[in-house]
Structure formats: structure tokens, C-alpha cells
Amino acid sequence: MSEEWYARPVLFVAHIDRTLDFYVNRLGFAQAWRYEENGKAVVAQVDRQGCVLIFSSQWPDKVGKGLMFISLNVNVAQGQFGAEVESALDKLRVEFETKGVDVKDGWWGYRLLVVCDPDGNELYFNYPEADEARVAEEAQ
């Protein structure tokens, strides 16, 4: 028997509808589902290109304390990794900023883009393998 594991991290938010608006209309995620109690959304899920996030408004004391790494993969020809990664990050930044998203530069041993959602949860968009690939290319 073969098993596959996957994770669906939960970010805690104050208002599901406001959060869905941000992730769907500004970050380009698609709403997968939402759960309501007494006519009010309390849990929802979004996804984009294999990244799945769940939002919950059920624990107010945890709102805005999330940090999520969203690693993006770039298929590139050998010798072109650095330029392709920089181009992909720049395109993502333009996509977000065009939709009114505040994007900051960050560093975690490699370049990343930092976006905060309306509740203060931080999203780090990165290519963690960039430095490894760059070192491998330089060694050749």
C-alpha cells in the first residue's frame, strides 16, 4: 500500500469573508470551500498551484500570528537558474502590487517576498533551492 501525505496549514483570521477577498482577488488563490455556522463563515480553504491554506476564525486569540513559507518551483534550463528565479520573483511582485498588495523584500538565506494578510499573518514567497543551484552552477 502506498500512502501520500499532504499538509493543509491553518491561518487564524478575524473575518473569513475579508480574508477570502484578499487571497482570492489579490493573491490569485481559488476558494475551494467554506463552512458556515448560523449563517457566518467560520472556516474556509483556498488553493493556488498546489498550495492549500485553511482559514479559521474559531480561535480569536491566535489571529495574526501565522507565518507561512510558500515555495515556488521554477523549471529552467541548466545555467539559467539565477536569472529565471529573479524574473519569476519580480513577476510575482508585479502581479501582487498591481492588485494593491504591499510587498516587501525579505531574506532567509535567500531572497524572498514578504506579504502580510489583513490579519497580520506573514506569507514568505521564496525559492529556497536558489542558492543551492547557484552554488552548483558556480562549481562547474
Q: Model segments located where?
A:
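Vicinal oxygen chelate
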Residues: 13-17, 69-122
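Active-site beta-strand termini and strand-to-loop segments that position acidic
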Residues: 45-49, 115-118, 128
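Acetyl-CoA-dependent GNAT
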Residues: 56-62, 93, 100, 105-106, ...
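Short, charged/polar surface micro-motifs in flexible loops or helix N-caps
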Residues: 49-53, 60-62, 75-79
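Conserved beta-strand in the GNAT
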Residues: 53-57, 114, 123-126
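Short acidic/glycine-enriched loop/turn segments that link adjacent beta-strands
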Residues: 38-42, 63-64, 107-111
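N-terminal beta-strand motif that seeds the catalytic metal site of vicinal oxygen chelate
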Residues: 1-20, 68-72, 127-140
